[in-house]
């Protein structure tokens, strides 16, 4: 009955991954974006943790992308699965599956567990029906469908359904119990015992009076202890003020069996209240129908390791796709463009492990958050390949350099997480990891100074990254003098070319971009890699930012005059 655990995130549970740091997720804005997907912190954290795990295997990426496409396009399936998941989640959170099994549990507890198993069966049936009726194409969902069908048709599962059905039929016949109470000379309860377990309910008598009516009439007092199979009874409320304290009430107020009971007749402990009657009946029913209790325990023990846990483990995985699908669909309805990513497999495109073709891409934060640039989103194209490995990105301040740098990082996080990317198309070779070298917070640079902290952090990143990593640098080494910063930056780019990782380095040091040919020639002579660095610029339209990028030589000016004119701080504007 046992089978391999199924996952909608990992086609191969042994696949290797690297986890992005919290700093990287923050630098890319993914931590804030994940918070938009759910109001529940636990779900936010789960989604972010899934996205932070970077699997370089293109099979994992394609597996996820195909699943997400099914979820996004099948809204009814999405809604139905959410409803089923809520039911399964309730069983997991409040049911007894996650509790230790108590061998001393009474029949009522056992039947409650049986009801939970029955609810689980209904959930599996519902998932089976939902998947069978949906137009799904992904290997992940087709595999899940087969997995559920295997559970659905499994001999053990079918037997469980039969066992539960039979047990429910047996236990449903438990309608009432008949209790015998002995009285002493003072009409006090002297002993109580179970006479029978009945398949009929007792019904309220319209002609019997209270206890005194019973003892006042001789024909109401039986001459023996043989029950006459009369299912009429006189109910009472032990909490009602009007109830007279009678010997019968005392009997009902003290109905708990002592552990030393034998033969079905027990002495009554003092001080217990009528609320303990249920506990008493638990014990006497267990005693009288021990064969049924034994049977229920056998069934529960037999199926204690059934695939409930495996199915409940799918809940957060499905939730991951559903939450993203709901949010992406919401943004699509607002007019934002999204597309399914495609991962290159080994053997395709000459197995270029550095390939990336991005078309019409933009920063997801522009769609999620209201910013200065949100009203004017400019899509861009960018390529990486075996030759184009490093981009030195220059342009005006607030011209969009950081925005596009973040966007490229987001593309890989989203695509390798299976989620549609913001843009028209994205074909790529997955990265082993993403590393960001953005300006650190001031309080983190007190010991080493800002430049010292940047150097230490870059060295740690460089040592951990490999040729298939993605490195994103944002104004690195710009916190010191131009000469010092340029010297460190140039050596860093040379080292990056030596390792061969895909890199975007946005900077205001235009001289660094001018020197790419020199660095490329040096690398070619050393024959370290065939990758090269290229200058990339953010275009200007006069004094206006275009946010459009292009591979081109740096324009060679700092745009300080345009900024000064915009804010009125030129000499002429200040002294006029």
Where are these regions (language model features)?
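ATPase nucleotide-binding head domains, primarily ABC-like/P-loop NTPase cores
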Residues: 351-576
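Long, charged, glycine-rich C-terminal linkers/tails
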Residues: 179, 325-363
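Structured, charged N-terminal subsegments at the starts of enzyme catalytic cores
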Residues: 188, 194-278
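Conserved amphipathic alpha-helical "coupling/scaffold" segments
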Residues: 1-204
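Glycine-rich, often proline-containing surface loops adjacent to acidic residues and nearby aromatics
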Residues: 99-100, 293-300, 390, 469-470
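Alpha-helical initiation/capping and key positions within long helical/coiled-coil segments
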Residues: 112, 306, 310-313, 450-453
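Low-complexity, highly charged intrinsically disordered N-terminal segments
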Residues: 305-332
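Extended, charged coiled-coil "arm/hinge" scaffolds of SMC/Rad50-like chromosome-maintenance ATPases
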Residues: 270-301, 308, 315
